[in-house]
């Protein structure tokens, strides 16, 4: 099991991340995660590089390959609760 607080701890190490969502889905009875990050507006690191760094940090923390993709600043809703950041599909 991967707990939301553990994922948040990894993501919050990156000051370039303004907001994020974790999408949880099931394929062939296996749970899968995808992390969607919204970079800070005006950030100095390209979004693709940020996604790669986060993916490596998640792999290091959980020994799993979790896909990470970036979206444009202002795309994700502001989330004040974990339940709005974790989406089950």
Language-model features: where?
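AMP-binding/adenylate-forming catalytic core of the ANL superfamily
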Residues: 1-64, 81
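Conserved C-terminal "lid"/linker of ANL adenylate-forming enzymes
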Residues: 60-89
